[in-house]
C-alpha cells in the first residue's frame, strides 16, 4: 500500500524498520485513543501517507533542525522523523495528554531524533531552525507570526493545507504548492517579519 503511493520508499534503505514503526504506532494510537480520545482520524494509513508524501515532491534531507507546531497525535512529524533520521525534530504540543502520547511514541519507536516540548511555540525561547512544519493548525499568517524568532531568511515553512491555501497566501511571493487530491503542501520562504 505505502510503496504504491510513495515513490521515495522504493529507494529507502530502512523500509522494514519503517513498517515496524508504523505498525507499533497504530497499535499504540488505538490503545491511547480508546482512553484519551486523542484524534478522530479514521484512516490512519491515509494520514501517514499524507504526512510523508511531500518527500515525493521535494528533498528535505538538508533540513537538520525541524519544528512541528501543534503536533497533536504526531502527524506529520513522527513519520517524517522515521524517514529523516539525521534531522532533529522539536514537537511543540501544549496538550498534556497529546504530549504524553508523543513521549510514549518517541520511546517505543526509538525515535532518538525527536524532542517533545509541552508548550505553545510562542511561549518557548526561540531558536533558529531550517524548517517549520504544521498541519491543519491555523492560517498561514498567524502561524508565521507565532514563529517569530524561530526563522530567518534560510528557513522554510512546510504547511499542510486544504483548498483555502491560495486565499491564505495573498500578498506572499516566495512559495511552491504541491497538490495531491484535497491536500496542498505549501513550501514557503519568509524574508522578513510580517508585523
Regions from the PLM with identified roles:
Residues 1-2, 6-62, 67, 97-101, ...:
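Class I SAM-dependent transferase core
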Residues 55-62, 83, 123-126:
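Glycine-rich helix-loop-beta junction characteristic of Rossmann-like nucleotide cofactor-binding loops
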Residues 68-72:
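Conserved S-adenosyl-L-methionine
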Residues 73-85:
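Conserved SAM-binding loop of SAM-dependent methyltransferases across substrates and taxa
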Amino acid at each position: 500500500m505505502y510503496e504504491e503511493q510513495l515513490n521515495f520508499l522504493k529507494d529507502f534503505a530502512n523500509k522494514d524498520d519503517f513498517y515496524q514503526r508504523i505498525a507499533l504506532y497504530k497499535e499504540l494510537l488505538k490503545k491511547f485513543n480508546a482512553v484519551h480520545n486523542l484524534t478522530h482520524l479514521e484512516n490512519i494509513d491515509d494520514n501517514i501517507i499524507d504526512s510523508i508524501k511531500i518527500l515525493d515532491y521535494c528533498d528535505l534531507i538538508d533540513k537538520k533542525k525541524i519544528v512541528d507546531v501543534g503536533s497533536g497525535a504526531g502527524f506529520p512529524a513522527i513519520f517524517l522523523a522515521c524517514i529523516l533520521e539525521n534531522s532533529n525534530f522539536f514537537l511543540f504540543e501544549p496538550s498534556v495528554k497529546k504530549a504524553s502520547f508523543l513521549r510514549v511514541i518517541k520511546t517505543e519507536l526509538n525515535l532518538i531524533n525527536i524532542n517533545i516540548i509541552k508548550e505553545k511555540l510562542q511561549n518557548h525561547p526561540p531558536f533558529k531552525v531550517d524548517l517549520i512544519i504544521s498541519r491543519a493548525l491555523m492560517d498561514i499568517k498567524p502561524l508565521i507570526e507565532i514563529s517569530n524568532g524561530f526563522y530567518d531568511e534560510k528557513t522554510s515553512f512546510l504547511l499542510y493545507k486544504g483548498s483555502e491555501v491560495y486565499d491564505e497566501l495573498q500578498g506572499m511571493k516566495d512559495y511552491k504548492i504541491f497538490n495531491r487530491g484535497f491536500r496542498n503542501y505549501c513550501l514557503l520562504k519568509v524574508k522578513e517579519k510580517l508585523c
